[in-house]
Amino acid sequence: MEVRLSNQLPVYPSFVPGIRRAPDRGYSLTPAQTETALKNALRYIPEELHEVLALEFMEELLTRGRIYGYRYRPEGDLKAKPVDQYKGQCLEGKAFQVMIDNNLSFDIALYPYELVTYGETGQVCQNWMQYRLIKQYLEILTNEQTLVIESGHPLGLFRSKPDAPRVIITNSMMVGLFDNQKDWHIAAQMGVANYGQMTAGGWMYIGPQGIVHGTFNTLLNAGRKKLGIPQDQDLRGHLFVSSGLGGMSGAQPKAAVIAGAASIIAEVDSSRIQTRHSQGWVQHVTEDKAEAFRMAQEAMQVREPISIAYHGNIVDLLEFAEAQAIRIDLLSDQTSCHAVYEGGYCPVGISFAERTELLSHDMDRFCLLVDQSLHRHFEVIKKLVACGTYFFDYGNSFMKAIYDAGVKEISRNGIDEKDGFIWPSYVEDIMGPELFDYGYGPFRWVCLSGKHEDLVKTDQAAMDCIDPNRRGQDRDNYNWIRDAETNRLVVGTEARILYQDAEGRLNIALRFNRMVRNGEVGPIMLGRDHHDVSGTDSPFRETSNIYDGSNVMADMAVQCFAGNAARGMSLVALHNGGGVGIGKAINGGFGMVLDGSERVDEILRSAMLWDVMGGVARRSWARNPNAMSTSAAFNESYGDWYHITLPFIPKEDLIQNSIRTSLKRKV
């Protein structure tokens, strides 16, 4: 067995006009670091090709800020094919090729030529040499081997066993002292760090559908909690305003329409607007602020949902609304503030093209403009909130970016960010207590056959597993999957997102595996977003509703990753910085290939409950009431196999009196 790149120099591929390209990420290496970066890239290449490619790679590094190895990119679009059209020694090896190609297809990827799937910087791997080697390894992978991927680099195949993971992935796991944006940028330029976001480097992205259900749930519950909307009604007659139409943020207009709202989403990049409009996820496009609000208000008057893309800057849009005293009910932001100085946030006052030019030629001025824009953004939101708007941070590091720009007023304690910010994140206020604390999270599956009829069958089977009368969340989820086909959510592979709790996920997984066994459908890939009950530790998002001090700890995400590996999930992944940026999160996920076997049934019975309830247990120990009741009920139902440690709750006056008495004695 030999896995290596060919001695033959590939033909340099052509670039399809109109396909988005990543901006220059910046070159800031020392001469010694530059030497190392070039050596690091050339170690993938047979020696006889070094002389040709050394200059080519240096040109990429100097002009793009990264060595992508464009010459090694396959020609054309990398659309996911049916699983049986891939080479492989085991089903898992073929299945993960489906997932990788889906992440990099023109329909899906934000910057396909730079291997960026979504979130401005989230990559499948660092370069096309890695891509080619990973594909080779997956083609020869057997069910007694595990492929290890470290920041995009395929370390190799290692002997394991059938019940072990077939692939183990880590991305950007920086040592603590160096776990910051500055040192990460150096490591990325040198070719040793890959920012995998969540499902980009974890090979589990299913297009913007993957976030639609979560956004739908967030908007509905925000309306119920903050606008007084009854549990059995939707957001008709209410206005939602936000920004971003990228790989994740592009879910906003679709989710808002499904929730019944009128929505205006600002986007500075016309190509992203065009993508969402052509997909039908945005109904109307305008560059006129007054027209955008007029269309929204007309739809609200007749209680019809509408989605409007405003081609322009969100700050301009909000300042117009404030000046005209236009009521905005729900307000958020989904610019890529985890990469705020890398192009993820376009400052007000300049065009998208000017932003890209500044990124390449005047980074200092760009960063200054970002800070000034964030100040203005903060001020206008503050005015709108004072007039009754409910603003929530959508977990994109937006408020942290404002704080880092020098606006200390946004911190809750007025000193630092350790106690959070003056406005809640959507997890803190909505998703945490209403969904995560019960175990509900973004479960998903991909029909590896590529057949739409398989997706229709699995939709029906999943719906049959849900009792809409059990909880309000179950009713919402039942309605979601019932209407999923009508809402035309698929972009890329035949896939579905469905929020479910621990029991729901297990029941659906077992049902699907039985369907595969009976020949009703082809093989299925199960997975989830890392943004889930147990998958991510981040005080700025997933664990922002943890108040016992452990919101800064990453034990849960690491234990979830390790536990899933021990229980035999087909793929396990652990990343740094998903969603909110390097140093601000530890996040993990899994992929589980359903082949219809009883072996898979046993893995599901062991792993699916663990994957969810480990997080519910942690939330329960943090004294979150809904997680405590969920854990207590779980102990009663599964007491023969499981037992979650439950907290005792002291009386508040006892705590206060004890502290007061002790401090008096000390004085």
Language model segments and positions:
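N-terminal ligand-binding/catalytic initiation module
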Residues: 1-214, 220, 224-227, 231-232, ...
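Catalytic cofactor-binding cores of redox enzymes
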Residues: 101-106, 112-113, 186, 192-199, ...
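Structural alpha-beta junctions
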Residues: 140-145, 260-261, 327-330, 383-390, ...
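General beta-strand structural signal in soluble alpha/beta enzymes
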Residues: 146-151, 169-170, 242, 265-266, ...
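Catalytic or ion-translocation cores adjacent to nucleophile or general acid/base/metal-coordination motifs
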Residues: 197-220, 224, 236-239, 245-303, ...
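Short, solvent-exposed amphipathic alpha-helical segments in soluble enzyme
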Residues: 257-259, 322-327, 348, 407-411, ...
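Core active-site phosphate/anionic-ligand binding loop and the adjoining beta-turn-alpha structural block
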Residues: 290-508
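C-terminal domain-closing interface element
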Residues: 295-304, 309-324, 328, 626-664
